[in-house]
């Protein structure tokens, strides 16, 4: 046998041996995961698992997550559960999972460990946003509280239970500074205070915001996220997350410069650095000096952008004064969010808006509660008042209608099925259909508002009863005259006929109305409600 044959023989033998090893590894891990052997006590990796719960209507998946974590943690007692849902439904969570949740905020020392650290005052770990592919809407903002709790105890609100003690002032400048150095600076500041104007230290709060770098003339230049990521990789801070960041930065760089960086692309490909699941720390650091100048050039061209502050949960209209609005104007707040929960407050709300505008604020917003104890027409009145104020004062107000859910009611806490005493399924569905077309918000523009919600209260009530397909594809059905035909038939019903037809329409269930009435005129009206969105889309496609 010649030398070449001998070498070929040993090469094939090595390949076979390697393939056998790989095959055995694949068999092992297939069995390991198929049989869920990672749940066995000897294979559990985690000494402590923390779970933050959110909305109560995520009940099922949250409970599943807690029970899953119990199987991963070395000791079940070291599974920690807290957050909104766990606080509101503490007893139910314990009953189902056997884990007793932490209630409220971790605002005292020694709750989790025997030390003097107060968890609630620690900076957030923004690196977790680098772990996911989903781009969090508020990813470019610091998140913080400058107060906790609320002095009001509104019956529809969970804040008194979540944050029972009102705290007038929490500093944030050091948090912002540390987070900026660790994770890279962020453009905006999102404050989650529930009632900041109730604070007796409001002026101090505004000054602290300025100290944190948010003044009216402050600008933001995007940090070199490649350098931020490499710095954290070097010290071993959340390496998995920042390897993903580095790979994303490579992709941005190559996308921007294209064929000009063919050599860099070839190098990254050779080092398996173009995919986060193949990229390794050593390869990133090895190629760092080669790619560093290109990132410096790319980031040197970033333009300054204006920074903004947002008290995201809104401020109390009843506490707005000339003085605090002028003080608020010292920081780049946009928008000023003023709660408008009830029509009964419309005079106070309108005065608050005018006061804010007189102080210089022209970008406003609010949350508009509905499906609570309000009449449907009261939602219309509040939205229209905002549009009227926009027209009169030449300002911008964006309204966000928020549907009420009784989060502690045993029949409704885990779903979104609750219908207020003055509402019904059809009315709720109409509002949702309109808001879907406006992306959940109602802005300025009188003609648009009139088309979306009606020019007066009568038109709004007509809209509430309108077939859903005719709401979603308003122009199409109006154009072919079908909307007018439906409305004429509806109006021609007698009071006695409406007494039969309206409850059927309000149920928003048109599957078997033939069994509920044999009145031909009512049946004719109800037939319009069986027009589906798919029918309209097909018809519009044919017309094109």
Where are these regions (language model features)?
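Radical SAM enzyme core and accessory elements
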Residues: 7-8, 15-20, 24-35, 42, ...
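Surface-exposed amphipathic alpha-helices with a cationic face
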Residues: 66-75, 158, 210, 357, ...
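Short, aromatic/basic amphipathic alpha-helical patches
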Residues: 64-69, 90-98, 204-210, 385, ...
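Conserved SAM/AdoMet-binding glycine-rich loop
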Residues: 178-365, 370-372
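Canonical Radical SAM [4Fe-4S] cluster-binding loop centered on the CxxxCxxC motif
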Residues: 136-178, 183-185, 197
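Glycine-rich beta-alpha loop elements in corrinoid/cobalamin-binding modules
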Residues: 2-140
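A structural motif corresponding to the C-terminal lobe/cap of the Radical SAM core domain
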Residues: 314, 327-492
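Aromatic/hydrophobic pocket-lining residues that form the small-molecule binding cavity
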Residues: 62, 172, 202, 321, ...
């Amino acid at each position: 046998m010649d030398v070449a044959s001998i070498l070929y023989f040993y090469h094939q033998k090595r390949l076979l041996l390697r393939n056998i090893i790989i095959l055995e590894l694949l068999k092992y891990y297939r069995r390991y995961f198929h049989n869920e052997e990672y749940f066995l006590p000897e294979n559990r990796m985690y000494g402590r698992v923390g779970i933050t719960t959110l909305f109560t209507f995520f009940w099922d998946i949250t409970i599943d997550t807690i029970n899953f974590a119990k199987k991963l943690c070395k000791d079940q007692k070291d599974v920690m559960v807290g957050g909104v849902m766990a606080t509101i439904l503490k007893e139910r969570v314990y009953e189902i999972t056997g884990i007793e949740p932490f209630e409220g905020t971790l605002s005292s020392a020694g709750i989790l460990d025997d030390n003097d650290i107060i968890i609630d005052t620690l900076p957030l770990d923004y690196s977790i946003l680098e772990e996911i592919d989903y781009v969090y809407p508020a990813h470019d903002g610091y998140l913080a509280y400058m107060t906790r709790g609320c002095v009001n105890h509104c019956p529809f609100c969970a804040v008194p239970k979540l944050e029972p003690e009102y705290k007038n002032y929490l500093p944030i400048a050091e948090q912002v500074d540390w987070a900026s150095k660790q994770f890279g600076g962020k453009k905006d500041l999102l404050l989650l205070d529930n009632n900041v104007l109730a604070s007796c230290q409001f002026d101090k709060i505004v000054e602290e915001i300025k100290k944190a770098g948010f003044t009216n003339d402050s600008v933001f230049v995007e940090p070199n996220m490649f350098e931020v990521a490499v710095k954290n990789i070097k010290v071993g801070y959340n390496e998995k997350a920042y390897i993903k960041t580095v790979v994303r930065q490579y992709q941005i760089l190559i996308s921007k410069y294209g064929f000009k960086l063919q050599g860099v692309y070839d190098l990254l490909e050779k080092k398996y650095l173009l995919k986060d699941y193949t990229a390794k720390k050593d390869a990133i650091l090895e190629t760092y000096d080669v790619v560093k100048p290109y990132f410096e050039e790319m980031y040197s061209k970033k333009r300054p952008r204006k920074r903004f502050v947002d008290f995201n949960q809104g401020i109390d209209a009843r506490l707005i004064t000339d003085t605090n609005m002028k003080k608020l104007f010292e920081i780049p707040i946009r928008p000023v969010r003023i709660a408008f929960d009830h029509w009964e407050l419309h005079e106070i709300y309108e005065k608050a808006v005018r006061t804010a505008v007189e102080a210089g604020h022209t970008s406003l917003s609010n949350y508009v509660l509905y499906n609570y104890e309000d009449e449907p027409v009261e939602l219309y009145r509040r939205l229209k008042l905002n549009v009227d104020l926009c027209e009169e004062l030449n300002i911008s107000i964006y309204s966000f209608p928020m549907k009420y859910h009784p989060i502690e009611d045993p029949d409704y806490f885990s779903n979104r099925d609750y219908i207020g005493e003055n509402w019904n399924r059809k009315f709720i569905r109409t509002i949702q259909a309109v808001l879907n077309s406006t992306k959940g918000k109602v802005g300025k523009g009188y003609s648009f508002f009139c088309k979306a919600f009606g020019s007066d209260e009568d038109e709004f009530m007509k809209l509430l009863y309108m077939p859903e397909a005719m709401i979603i594809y308003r122009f199409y059905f109006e154009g072919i005259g079908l909307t007018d035909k439906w409305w004429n038939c509806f109006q021609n019903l007698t009071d006695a006929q409406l007494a039969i037809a309206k409850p059927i329409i309000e149920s928003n269930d048109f599957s078997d109305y033939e069994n509920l009435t044999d009145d031909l005129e009512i049946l004719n009206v109800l037939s319009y409600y069986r027009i589906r969105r798919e029918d309209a889309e097909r018809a519009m496609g044919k017309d094109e």
